[in-house]
Amino acid sequence: MKKTFVCYYHIIKELLKVIFNQKKYYHNYITCGEKSIQIRKDLEKCGIKFRIEIAPEIYGLEIPAVIIANHMSTLETLLLQGIFPENVKCDYILKKELINYPIFGKVLSVLQPIAITRKNPRLDFEIILKEAKNLFEQNISLIVFPQGTRYNIISPEQFTTIGVKLAKHYNVPVIPVALVTDAMGQGKLIKDFGKFDVTKEVCFAIDKPFYVVNQKEAMNHIVSFITKKVKEWGRTDLLSNCE
C-alpha cells in the first residue's frame, strides 16, 4: 500500500504541474512528452523496472502514423508519449469518460485527443475520420487501443480493426506496439486506478512501421508481434489462444 501511495504521489504531482501551467503544455507535444518521461523516472525511483525496445526505423519517421497497441492499464496512457522519440508526436483515441476524470481528464484535454463513446461504432468512426485528418495534417500520430478496454489476458478476438481501417483510409503507416503494464492494477472503486506492484517489470516494444494492404493480414501481423514480445518477456500467463 505504501508503494502505491508513493507512486500516485509522483504521478499526481506531475499532472498538477501540467494543470497549473497549461499555457506551457497546451498543444505542445514536446513538453507533454517530457512530462511523461518524468513520470517514468519517478516510477523508477519507486522501484518499478522498465524495458523499452524501439525499432531503428522509428527514429527516422517524418510522417504521421497510426500507433496500435494492446491495452492493459492506465499506465500506457500516462507513458506512451514519452516512450516515442521526439520526432513522433502522438495523441490518443480514448473513451470520452476519461476526459471527465478529475486531474487526469484535464491533463488529457491539454492536447487534442479524439474522444469517443464506444456506444455507436459507426458514429465513433465518423468522428475519428474527421478529427484524425486535422491531426495528421499537423504531423501528429494517433495511438489506438483496438481492444476497447483494458485486458490482463490477451486474446486475438479482442482486437477490432478500427486502427488499420483508419491507417488505410488516410494511407498512413501503422506502428505496432506491444506492452505489459500490469504493474498498475485495476481498482475496485475506480477501474482505471488500482494498486501498484513494483515487482512487475513494465515493458514496451515498438515495431517498425508498415502500410496496410490487407486489413486481416495487418491485424494478424500486429497481434503476432504483440504475442511474440509478451512471450519473449516471459509473460505467457498473459496470453490466451495466441499461439
Explain the meaning of each model-derived region.
Residues R150:
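Short active-site segment of divalent metal-dependent hydrolases/proteases
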